Amino acid sequence: MKKKVISAILCGAMVLGTVCPVLAADDKSEDTKTEAAAGDSAKGKKIALVGKAAGNAFFEIAAKSFQETVEAEGGEVQVVYPETATADAQIKVLDNLISQDFDAICISANDVNALQAKLEEAMDEGIKVSSFDSAPNKDSREIFVNQAGTKEVAQALMDAVLDISGGEGQFAILSATSQSANQNAWIDAMKTI
């Protein structure tokens, strides 16, 4: 129970870090930015949260906290999952969201580069684009919020391998998909430990 509470608090903080700066970027006034970041920047906004795929426990906790936080500030959230954990499926989701006049899209990307054209289209339409967990490239978003440092995750994973194996034998590293940016970064970092 304690872990769930801590996870929810961390997810809520991550949500605020993802949503508030992006929506506050509408107004260039420093005072307005500060006020928006303080809590009411989601008021009246329609925000989409796009996951990698349905059924991911981490994302479901994050989505719940995201929705609670935005709705508490007067915004509306639509949580959307692609049919499959692929960039092509996320592109279909993004097409649909762009046509629905969302104010902001926050995405956990299935591919670093494949979403660029569609996310740039969204930004050209005035939609604020942010990401968390797994980032598209820098040209495809306005902000990325990382839930944990790459090296720290890699170290924790390697510590778990050591604990389980007792320091002997071989182990395999599996990723959800070959294009999963965050997981591939963790794997690369694990190889250096």
Model-predicted segments: where are they?
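A residue-level marker of the well-folded mature domains of exported/periplasmic proteins
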Residues: 2-5, 9-10, 14, 21-193
